[in-house]
Amino acid sequence: MALNIENIIAEIKEASILELNDLVKAIEEEFGVTAAAPVAVAAAGAADAGAAKDSFDVELTAAGDKKVGVIKVVREITGLGLKEAKELVDGAPGIIKEGVATAEAEEIKAKLEEAGASVTLK
């Protein structure tokens, strides 16, 4: 009987849970790997990605009481017309600008908060 993938899969399908467990342990010992490693690596990778974030989306969460001032700042930041900027502010929460560098995002946030808006960086 030739050793090929179809034969291996057929044998695995016929094996019991205990036999498959023994197979996994034998493979781990033979090749120096663990079956649980990918889960731990994925979790660690996600934590690193959050710490190394260098671009943000600026989200207007609420316009506040001084809507006119917020609309002016939104027009300045985005280059939108009056109608589009008003719709964006009235439709809060919404993204004002996407993929902005950290320094620029902080500057935009400060301008909007100074105008009376509530802003988050995502």
UniProtKB/Swiss-Prot annotation:
Biological process, per Gene Ontology: translation
Key word S-adenosyl-L-methionine present: no
UniProt keyword list: Ribonucleoprotein, Ribosomal protein
Any one of the GO CC terms: cytosolic large ribosomal subunit
CDD domains tied to this protein: Ribosomal_L7_L12
Pfam assignment, any one: Ribosomal_L12
Example GO molecular function: mRNA binding
InterPro entries (UniProt xref): Ribosomal_bL12 (IPR000206), Ribosomal_bL12_C (IPR013823), Ribosomal_bL12_C/ClpS-like (IPR014719), Ribosomal_bL12_oligo (IPR008932), Ribosomal_bL12_oligo_N_sf (IPR036235)
Family: Belongs to the bacterial ribosomal protein bL12 family.
Function: Forms part of the ribosomal stalk which helps the ribosome interact with GTP-bound translation factors. Is thus essential for accurate translation.
Assembly and oligomerization: Homodimer. Part of the ribosomal stalk of the 50S ribosomal subunit. Forms a multimeric L10(L12)X complex, where L10 forms an elongated spine to which 2 to 4 L12 dimers bind in a sequential fashion. Binds GTP-bound translation factors.
Protein name: Large ribosomal subunit protein bL12
Taxonomic lineage: Bacteria, Bacillati, Bacillota, Bacilli, Lactobacillales
Annotated gene: rplL
